[in-house]
Amino acid sequence: LMLHPGVIDELTNPDMLSERFDQTEFEHDLTRRRSALKSIGEDDDEALLNLLRRAHHAEVFRTLARDIEGVLTVEQVADDLSALAESILRTTTQWCWERLRNRHREDHQFAVIAYGKLGGKELGYGSDLDIVFVYEDADERAGEVYANLVRKLINWLTVKTGEGALYEIDTALRPNGSSGLLVTSFDA
């Protein structure tokens, strides 16, 4: 609460303890909030990084409150935290793609594959994300474009702003280990 005092507002919602995390609702809310920022010309990278962090911290706080009150089982906490991470990954990937200068197509042909706690839907508070990145795109520029996307995505997920951080990212599980490419084509 000291680091993110804004989450205290979550306690004013009388339904907070009885609700569960809803990925669709969370992602629609992020889209609405981004549109509101865009309408006033405030949707630069820093604003979006902070928007993601505020939404993430608020949802983790709601999950923690439900956990402390005994409303959720350990498995439900892990499910909700894992679903939150998936939503953050999906949204951040899309936003990074839209902002990528050298993209060669409208929609990416790219996936984030989760291993470890996230892959097993066993994420806990403060867990890192063990993820690898793959693409299926025959364009000759694809390798470079998706490598740029991955660098941007990792930065957006890990950089600490005034609103804090999102996740630590561990990419060591990629096919060739720490020395391998950050992103691999399906054909490789």
Task: Please give the residue ranges for each predicted region.
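Non-catalytic regulatory/linker segments of enzymes
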Residues: 2-188
